[in-house]
Amino acid sequence: MKNKKNLSFLICLLIPLIVGSFSGFITRYEVDGTWFNLLKKPSFNPPNWVFAPVWTTLYTLMGISLYIIWMNSFGEIRKKAVFVFSLQLLLNFLWSILFFYSHLILYGLFDIILLWICICWMIIKFTGINLI
């Protein structure tokens, strides 16, 4: 049983980390590229080196939350929670592609709005499953 829990934890952790790594791989040249460097950014924009550790931490926390949901829900409740999580992860992935790779700022904004709605939906769904 413990090995099954460890495997579930590892899989839940790896899913968002792989998605994040893949989007980072696709957009790696764009983040330091001319297009992004020429954008007008606010004074509080953090330096580029901050993003890798912050996103790694966020994707790790997403994986932990997926594991908590996986272990504490069953049936239709689990199915809906994993669907919302997957939708959020897809929107997260798409934002990097839309903004950095394709330079589609307006579509990136639309994606972020959908992502925030999905995150709120996810918080509501996950809160009903487990209050840590």
Residue ranges and their predicted role:
Residues 60-72:
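Transmembrane alpha-helical segments in integral membrane proteins
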Residues 15-23, 62, 91, 95:
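Alpha-helical transmembrane segments of multipass membrane proteins
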Residues 3-26:
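N-terminal signal-anchor transmembrane alpha helix
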Residues 46-61, 103-115:
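Membrane-interface loop-to-helix entry segments
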Residues 30-43:
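Membrane-interface helix termini and inter-helical loops of multi-pass transporters
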